[in-house]
């Protein structure tokens, strides 16, 4: 804790907690679990290079405050900008991570049901006063900034096997040229079983909300399709997912949004 760039006020708030660094996440944010006698908290930190991007925890703070009463999200306890860092202190989400509660091989139908429940929840939210719009224009402008400042995920070895591009700029050019029409709804922006909490068989919480906001309805759906294929692996469960949603898949959009995520 001594090496953290935090204010005296924040240090006082967390001094009685045992600090454990999270090593699971893939984002550039630093995340710490703060273990207390009666409760656990989380501290999430991003440096100034990410200010204004979807990685910026100030953006996540704004969305968490806006989502209060709309979705089950952690409570914002403290936010600050200090010594070149943005620091967000929040409560622990209620329930257990979906990825820990349900094994992909043992409970595939339940996981599909939860994904469909999430999509229905998101699409029911009124976005008229949502503070952020993650339209393709804004995401591609962000991606251009990240690429120009060596902040994008450019490890091509981690790309999907069928991604037909040689380098990040070639993929970026394709994404910019082939933008689909958008139908804006509320979107989580990074939906998967490691960002969903469950309790008594129902969705009980969401975390990692920095990319949430207005976005095309197929954005989160594409993430669900990718997760189902990678984690469960049987196409019948993709079909079940769309049956539960009561819609037909738009495969062009699904492919596009999976490609977009290759660089984040």
Curated annotation (Swiss-Prot):
Highest taxon, organism lineage: Bacteria
Catalytic activities: kanamycin A + ATP = kanamycin 3'-phosphate + ADP + H(+)
EC category: transferase
Gene Ontology MF terms in the entry: ATP binding; kanamycin kinase activity
Active site location: 190
Keyword tags: Antibiotic resistance, ATP-binding, Kinase, Nucleotide-binding, Plasmid, Transferase
Keyword Transferase belongs to the record: yes
Annotated GO biological process: response to antibiotic
Pfam families according to UniProt: APH
SUPFAM superfamilies: Protein kinase-like (PK-like) (SSF56112)
EC number of the protein: 2.7.1.95
Record-stated family: Belongs to the aminoglycoside phosphotransferase family.
Function: Resistance to kanamycin and structurally-related aminoglycosides, including amikacin.
Protein name: Aminoglycoside 3'-phosphotransferase
Organism, scientific name: Enterococcus faecalis (Streptococcus faecalis)
């Amino acid at each position: 804790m001594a090496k953290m760039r935090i204010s005296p006020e924040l240090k006082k708030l967390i001094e009685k907690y045992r600090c454990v660094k999270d090593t699971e996440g893939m984002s550039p944010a630093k995340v710490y679990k703060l273990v207390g006698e009666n409760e656990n908290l989380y501290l999430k930190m991003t440096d100034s290079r990410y200010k204004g991007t979807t990685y910026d925890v100030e953006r996540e703070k704004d969305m968490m405050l806006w989502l209060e009463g709309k979705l089950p999200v952690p409570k914002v306890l403290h936010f600050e900008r200090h010594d070149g860092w943005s620091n967000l202190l929040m409560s622990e989400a209620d329930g257990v991570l979906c990825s820990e509660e349900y094994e992909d091989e043992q409970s595939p139908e339940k996981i599909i049901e939860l994904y469909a429940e999430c999509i229905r929840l998101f699409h029911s939210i009124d976005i008229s006063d949502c503070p952020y719009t993650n339209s393709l224009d804004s995401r591609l402008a962000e991606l251009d900034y990240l690429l120009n400042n060596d902040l994008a995920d450019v490890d091509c070895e981690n790309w999907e096997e069928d991604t037909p591009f040689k380098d990040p700029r070639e993929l970026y050019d394709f994404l910019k040229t082939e933008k689909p029409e958008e139908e804006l709804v509320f979107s989580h922006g990074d939906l998967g079983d490691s960002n969903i909490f469950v309790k008594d068989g129902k969705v009980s919480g969401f975390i990692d909300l920095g990319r949430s906001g207005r976005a095309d309805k197929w954005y989160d759906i594409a993430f669900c399709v990718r997760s189902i294929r990678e984690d469960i692996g049987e196409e019948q469960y993709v079909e079940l997912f769309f049956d539960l949603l009561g819609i037909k898949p738009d495969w062009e959009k699904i492919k596009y949004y999976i490609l977009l995520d290759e660089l984040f």
